[in-house]
Amino acid sequence: MVYQGKYRPLIIFGTSSGAGKSLVVTALLRIFSDMGIDTVPFKVQNMSLNAGVGIGGEMAYAQIIQARAARVYPSVLMNPILLKPEENKTHVILVGKYYGTFSSGDYMRSKKEEIYKIALECFNRLQSEHELVIIEGAGSPAEINLDNDIANLRIAKDVKAKGILVADIERGGMFASVVGTLELIDFRDMIGIIVNKFRGDESLLYKGYEFLERKFGITVLGTIPYIEHNLPEEDSLANWTKKEGRIKISIVKLPHIANFTDFEIFESIEDVGLVYAKKPEELKNSDVIIVPGSKLTVADLEYLRKEGFEDEIKKQYRDGAFIIGICGGYQMLGKYIIDNVESKKGKVLGMNLLEDSKTEFFPYKKTNRIFGHILHPYFYGYKIEGYEIHMGITISRNYFSKIYREGNRYIKRFDGSYYKNVIGTYFHGLFDNTKFTESFINYIRERKGLDKVKLKIESLDERINKIANIFKKKVDIKKIIDEIKIS
């Protein structure tokens, strides 16, 4: 292979899901960017319900964060295959556009090779335009039951990448998982190992590190302490826990929830309590209820109705709670949904909390980076930016915001709806706009007789820099550079 850049590609493997691959990629991208190296992220295939919009359409939110770390604009070339699970099937996004919905077996048997070739072309484009591509693997490269895994060894060997193995010591059994992984995989270009999430005396690990070097000839590049980084996690849905605070914000835990990054910012805001409601009674005494996005809007609306969530949401609204619907949640709050695409159930009544909002689904999806300002009288004029990913068009009258830009194109259109204490919007990332979020939290605080506060929210760049600085101190960056640099 002829390398277009100055460096061989670098792939980050993990001993398991959740080992810290995304974190390591993010840190290295920022470190190399700081060094003046033109670096970009790449992940062949990502299975995630957290999606965003980059150049070319829809892509995994993790690679959008990584592009930010590299200080480049996110592109669908960085995540050519996005798998979004729904029921017993998988919704496939290929190079930013909807490709089809398949059972896992059908996708593995009939589509994977065809799609992989397209993904490899995306990698080659990135490699030709940048100095260094850092690839994030998926899960573990040692899944011996999978003979057609395209996200780990296949891509690594096809592009002749050098590798780093990330191991999570917090779970226990770290040395066994490293030894097992290295024994099971046939990969001769491993630079070294990064041990992640360590708490305690590092010297206690040195004997094990010496064993790994004797057995495999591979050194440990660094030991990373446990970091409270507050970056969005691909699998963070599994880690939801209740958070206490005088302001109670309740998130309705939909069966087919999508884009739960929309409210992760509340995890880091002091005195804000978070409840991820699995039962209607958990919504009681809420100050704010958020109905999030959904992969299957009508199915989730019917679930809310059947399980008693709709009645409780309406009761909380009457008691003064602020109700917010984002994307599919917005559609559910309206008067009705006409769905001949997803559920094919035709006209379905909504919750009617936004009675001027009526939605009809169409077989195409809108994916845009959007910029606007708020029209709601409580928060009028605040500038917001985010992205929209949705099927369907919603007609309303009392618009929540005015959009003035889509991507690089200046336009004039409107988004969402509001009525008193109910807001519906297609703006994913709404609460990442910290000036608006501070105003919103203080509005809720004032209603409860609490003093206004200045929110202490670190920007995404500040959080990335904090992680990168730890890695600079703890990881042998020079060895990595020496191994991948093309002489």
PLM region spans:
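Catalytic nucleophile serine of serine hydrolases
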Residues: 327
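Extended, hydrophobic alpha-helical segments
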Residues: 304, 311, 317, 333-338, ...
